[in-house]
């Protein structure tokens, strides 16, 4: 499955314990998607388009109205990295 770099970054943050919280307008439409790491930092790569793409591919899901988290399918499609914070050139 083809996954773009912003989608990969978002999935890595979710795999490490992060979550996606949505903000909706009065009609129920999504205004913004905020990806928060387990440390509480916001990930700037996570946009509404990235969120919708990950949800469409069923790589993320929400349970009981909670924040969106990575699914088993998302973990299976995630490419392994030594450390998400360090580029390949640093090693």
Swiss-Prot record:
Signal peptide location: none
Pfam families: YjhX_toxin
Family: Belongs to the UPF0386 family.
Protein name: UPF0386 protein CCNA_00226
Species for this entry: Caulobacter vibrioides (strain NA1000 / CB15N)
């Amino acid at each position: 499955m083809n996954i773009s770099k912003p989608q990969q970054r978002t999935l890595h943050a979710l795999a490490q314990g992060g979550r996606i919280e949505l903000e909706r307008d009065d009609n129920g439409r999504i205004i913004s998607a905020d990806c928060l790491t387990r440390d509480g930092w916001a990930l700037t790569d996570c946009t509404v388009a990235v969120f919708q793409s990950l949800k469409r591919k069923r790589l993320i899901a929400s349970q009981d109205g909670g924040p969106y988290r990575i699914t088993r399918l998302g973990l299976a499609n995630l490419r392994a990295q030594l450390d998400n914070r360090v580029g390949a050139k640093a090693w």
